[in-house]
Amino acid sequence: SEGQLMRIVITGASGNVGTALLRRLAAAGSAHDLVGVVRRPPEPAGPYESVHWHSLDVAGADAADRLRPIVAGADAVVHLAWGFQPTRNTDYLSRVGVGGTAAILDAAHAESVGHLLHMSSVGTYAAGRYGCRVDESWSTSGIASSPYSRDKSAAEAVLDRYEHEHRGTGVAITRMRPGFIVQRGAASGQMRYFLPGYIPMSVITHLPVLPLDRRLCIPIVHADDVADAFARALDRGAAGAFNLAAEPPVSRDDVADALGARAVHLPSAVLGRLVDLSWRARLQPIDRGWSDMAFSVPLLDCGRARTELGWQPRWSAA
C-alpha cells in the first residue's frame, strides 16, 4: 500500500529498466527491502549497493523451485528479466522470456506473494493499427514474424491463463506495456545488441545517410519514466495493463536528425529483406523481426496510466 515499506524482489534488476527502478526507489527516500535476481550480480556500488543479490538464470528448468525461497515473504515481485541475444537461439530466448515468466509466477503463487508486476511491451500488440493509438484492450496476439513479439505475447498468455484459472484470487498482476525503451546512459549497451562487435560505436553517429521507410512512426519512452510507472503501481497496488509512451511518436526524420544523417526512403519490405540477408550472413545480430515490428506495432494511448497511476512522462520523445 502507498507509503508502506515493502520487501520487493526484482528480476533483471541490473538491466536498463531495473537500474532505473533502483534509482527511482532510492530517490523517493524509501527503505524498501530490495532483492535482485540476475544471472551475474553487479558490483555492489551506486544503485546496486543496498540490494540483496541472487544469481539465477530464470531460463533454468529448476528456476521456479529456486525462486520460491527468494520470493518467500515478498510483498511484490517486479519481473523485468528478458533475453535479447543471441537472436539465433530462439529456444533459449523463449525459455528466458516465456519460461521465466511462468517460473516467477509459479513461485509467487506458491509463496502467496500479493503482487506481480510484469514487463510486457508494445511488441505484444497485434498489427493492424500502425500510426494509430490503441488502448490496453487491443489484441495481444503479437507480430508473427518477430520472435521477440511472439515471446512477449506468449508471456502475457501465461498471465491470462493464470488470471482465468484464479478469477480474482491469488497473485494480483500488473502488465506494463511500454513503447521502445531508450536511455542515454544505456545507449551503447542497446546498440551493442544490434551491431557486430567489430563495428565501433562511433560509426553510428557518423552515418552520412539513413535508408529508412518514410512511414516510420513508433512509440518510445525513457527508462526513467517506465521505472516511475512501476514505482507508482507498487505504491498503489495497481493491477491490470498500462500503456507507457512519451509524445510525440518518433518518425524517420527524428532518427535521421538524431544521427546527423540525411534520410533516404527505403521501403520497409526492402529493408526487411536486407536485414534478413545480413543477419543470415552473420554480418549483424538483429533479426528481421525487429524491422517488421517497427513497421507493425501501433502507437499507445496512455490515458489509463495517467488516470490510475498519476503517471506523466518527464522525458519527451522529441
Regions from the PLM with identified roles:
Residues 55-99, 107, 127:
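NAD(P)H-binding glycine-rich loop region in Rossmannoid oxidoreductase-like domains
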Residues 262-265, 286-318:
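C-terminal amphipathic/interface module of NAD(P)-dependent oxidoreductases
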Residues 145-174:
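Active-site Tyr-X1-5-Lys
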Residues 8-30:
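N-terminal Rossmann NAD(P)H-binding glycine-rich loop of SDR-like oxidoreductase domains
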Residues 198-249:
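Alpha-helical substrate-binding/gating segment
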Residues 227-288, 302:
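Mid/C-terminal beta-alpha module of Rossmann-like enzyme folds, strongest
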